[in-house]
Structure formats: structure tokens, C-alpha cells
Amino acid sequence: MAEAATGFLEQLKSCIVWSWTYLWTVWFFIVLFLVYILRVPLKINDNLSTVSMFLNTLTPKFYVALTGTSSLISGLILIFEWWYFRKYGTSFIEQVSVSHLRPLLGGVDNNSSNNSNSSNGDSDSNRQSVSECKVWRNPLNLFRGAEYNRYTWVTGREPLTYYDMNLSAQDHQTFFTCDSDHLRPADAIMQKAWRERNPQARISAAHEALEINEIRSRVEVPLIASSTIWEIKLLPKCATAYILLAEEEATTIAEAEKLFKQALKAGDGCYRRSQQLQHHGSQYEAQHRRDTNVLVYIKRRLAMCARRLGRTREAVKMMRDLMKEFPLLSMFNIHENLLEALLELQAYADVQAVLAKYDDISLPKSATICYTAALLKARAVSDKFSPEAASRRGLSTAEMNAVEAIHRAVEFNPHVPKYLLEMKSLILPPEHILKRGDSEAIAYAFFHLAHWKRVEGALNLLHCTWEGTFRMIPYPLEKGHLFYPYPICTETADRELLPSFHEVSVYPKKELPFFILFTAGLCSFTAMLALLTHQFPELMGVFAKAMSDIFCSAEFRDWNCKSIFMRVEDELEIPPAPQSQHFQN
């Protein structure tokens, strides 16, 4: 019964929609016919005469007040529309018209929409999963104590947001802890330290973990089987405590490097011991996974310290060795550190070799990969590139490849060119970035701006060609050219990652709908007329009379000119030529 009732209601609704869509003229004439028949019982003539009498008795002040009230209501609607547009990025009236009025007028077929939703469900879910805004660890992140804190001491501004630091705390708990940490006192202390919000409390906990390891303890390990001779050993050093001190307490890169070297000595020993025991159970396997993450992190940060201190070749060697030793750990994105160091050495052939390995369609892209590929192709033609010459003779094959590479990079992250061309000021990059977002653009430009400046003409080529990308993707939120559509959620995530004193770059820029602009103009013009009429009624009356006379005279002049032209055409009409005498009979 319920299904039958539902089907009957759907049929009734479809009939009503069909009647409103195709038979609106019939409905209109039916209404007029009913009004004509019921004109006597409804006393329409008397009501019309009463209304006309009421309107004739109204004074000009009433119309002024009515105009002012309508202007006030229009202004309130405009303010609400502007607020709704700033918050949600769309017009409220347009959304209501499309979402509610259009289905009532028969613009949407429920059956077809359901079928399309069921058939395209997989593609929609894939689109959502791809466009989901995932936050990534910045592979080129700075040191808190030696770089971020020094910036705070000088400027008084906090370069990191609470959301960014909270993500870092979650990363540290994921990389540097495991379920068996409670069995070792130092690791148990560090497990609590990574959750601590106060920096001084974290540093104190790291010192406490190191002090525990200074106590000599008797480890019951027989030197000889079935022997009563015991060896006295020192507890292994806590590598994660050294990591925390190097990241947050060290005020210079040199101090951080010393602490990381001590962490490397402790972490390497723990890694070798857990490597031998990893197959003895899930607990040992988790410890080995944790020790591997700790060792990779320490070596990567040591390479970054060498890069900061000017030992670039040493840093490149350390990064290459680390990538060979742990090829499966791609979550640290060490290849991006390697690309930046190779660009500093101007080893462009090695950079091309790294790009050939990582610039693959199956791997996730980044601004570093896309813009480095564009830089290499621009380097081949940028020194001889001239916009005037290119407009005359056209682009060569190499120039076309460079322009296409720039368009590809700009489509992936459209925020980078403004920082490379110094149209926007740079800030310290955050510890986490959003791919294709403003945070990734800042992180890339902060380290790679010098490499673009070093290549002669590269920034000039970028300046001349980067805006051409937007003509290829007129609707970037709906359809991309080489990549997926640009995600909508980048602005919100970037505002969480970047400090409040930075103006977040928004793409694509939200433009005010025509309805809001038209309402604003009409409201302002009507309010101005009402105010002038109230203040200067006689002058506005003269002005209105003059405008009506002008329009009437203009219409009369147009009609008079047309009549004159018609008379002239009639008078200038050429009569037919007489026949020649040679053809008369």
C-alpha cells in the first residue's frame, strides 16, 4: 500500500509539473476567465475604484517614504548576499533558484538523476578521494630552535600555527614511538614528551630521559654459557631525546648538527639490535620499524644541516646514500632535498636524472618536481627568448616545450609564480604543506627562488607565459587540462597552516555575481533619488519635468527625421528610362 501511494503521489507530482511546464498559457486563460465570471460577486469594479481613490489621495511624502523603505530592505538583502557569498562562495538567491525553484518548474528529472548517480557513483567517489586535501610533511622544513625561534625573537611574530605544530606532534608520535616504549624508562618519558604542548616541558623531559641513561645498571648477560660471570653495561642512549633537543633547544645549525651526530650514534646502535630481533615477534617488528624511522630522520636532518652550513657536496652524498639504503621510505620525500642541493651545485644533468625517476605519472606530483622540470626546459631557451621576436616568427620547438612545461607547472600550483616573480612577499615556510596550495608555493619559492634567478632569462620567460595557463582551464574547479580539477578546500586548509599575518593566495579568485552588483547599483541610485526628492522636492520636480521634455522631444525629433527621410526618398525616386527610337515599330 505504501509503495502504491508513493507511486500515485509521484505520478500526480509529475502531472502537475508537466502541466506547469507546457500548459501555462491554458492555465493563464482559465484564471482570466474565472476572474471575468466572478467580477460581480467579488466586486472587482468597486475595489478598483477604491484603490484608485486611495492612490489619488497619497502625498509625495508617502512615495518618498516608500522608496526609502524599499532602499533599506534592498540594502539589507545586499549585505546578507555579500556575507553569504564571502562565507560560502555562491549567491544565496542563485542557489535557491537553482536548487529549489528549478525542480518545481520541471528542470530536473528525478529518475534520470537517480540513474546517473547510481551509474557514476564510483567516478564521484574517486573524484572526491583524489581532490581530498591531504596535508603532507614539508621535506624542506626548517629547524624550530635555530630558525623559527630566531625569527620570533627578532620580529615578535609566531611563524607556526597551532594546527601546524599539532600535526608535527602527531608525526613525531607516529615515527618515534611504539607500543613497547613503556618497557624502557627513557622511551616512556619521550612518549609523554611528544604529546606535551609546552616547549620548555618537552625540553625538560628530553634532558630527564638522557639523565636516566647516565645511570649504570647491571644487565644480566652471561659472557659464557652457564657461567656466573656478568657484564656491566650502560643503558643505550635515547636517540629521540637528542632529536628533540636538536630540533627545539639548539639555537644554531652547528649546535643542532652536534646533537644529531650524538643521536645518530645512539640510533644506529638501536637499529642494529632491533634488526637482528625483528623476526622474533610483532613487538620486535614494531621496534625495528620505529628505529628505522628514527635513523632515516636523523640522517636526513644531518644532510640538511650540512646543506645549511655550505657543505653541499657532502649533503648530496648523504642523501644519495640514504636513498640507496632505504629506497622504500618515500614518505620523507628525500628526493626533493636532493633536487634542491643539486640545483645549488648547478648539476643540471644530475637533476634531470632524478626527475626522470620521480616525475612519473604513477607517483604523486609536487611543485618541486613540476617547476624544476620547467626550469630545466626554460634554461635551454631563456637566455635568447624575446617576446617580440617570438610574436614575429613564432615559437621554436624548444621554446614550445618550455612554455608547455611552465603551463603544466602553473596548472599544478598556480600560486608559485607570484612568489618567484616577487609579486607577493615570502614568509617562513610551514612544517606541513598542502599540495597545489599556497603553503606548498611558499615552501618551494623560499628555497628555489635563488635557483630561478641564477638561470638567465628564466624569470622573464615565466613572466611572459605563466598567465596563458588560465586560458586553457577556464573552469579549473570543474575540469583540468593535465591534472585533476583544482581542489576547492585549499583555501581553508592553507588558512589553518599559515600564520594570520600572511595574506593567503586564493585560486580561482571569487568574483561577485552580477546580481549583487546590479542590486547594489539599483539600491544606491534609488536611495539617492529618494534623499534628493525629500530634501529638494521643487528642484527634483523641475528636473523630472525637464527630463520628460527631453525624452519627448527626442522621440519627436526621431519621428520627424524619419518622415523627412521618407519624403526625400520619394522625391528622389528615378523614373524608368524611355525606350530607344531604334526599337520602335
From Swiss-Prot:
Q: Which residues are glycosylated?
A: N47
> Looking at the keywords, is ATP-binding present?
no
InterPro entries, alphabetically?
A: ST7 (IPR007311)
Q: Which interval of the chain is the signal sequence?
A: none
Q: Which UniProt keywords apply?
A: Glycoprotein, Membrane, Phosphoprotein, Transmembrane, Transmembrane helix
Phosphoserine modification sites are S386
Q: In the UniProt record, which is one GO cellular component term?
A: membrane
Q: How does it sit in the membrane?
A: Multi-pass membrane protein
Q: Where are the transmembrane segments?
A: 15-35, 62-82, 512-532
Cellular localisation: Membrane
Q: Does the keyword Transmembrane apply?
A: yes
The record's similarity note reads: Belongs to the ST7 family.
Which protein is depicted?
A: Suppressor of tumorigenicity 7 protein
Source organism lineage?
A: Eukaryota, Metazoa, Chordata, Craniata, Vertebrata
Name the gene for this chain.
ST7
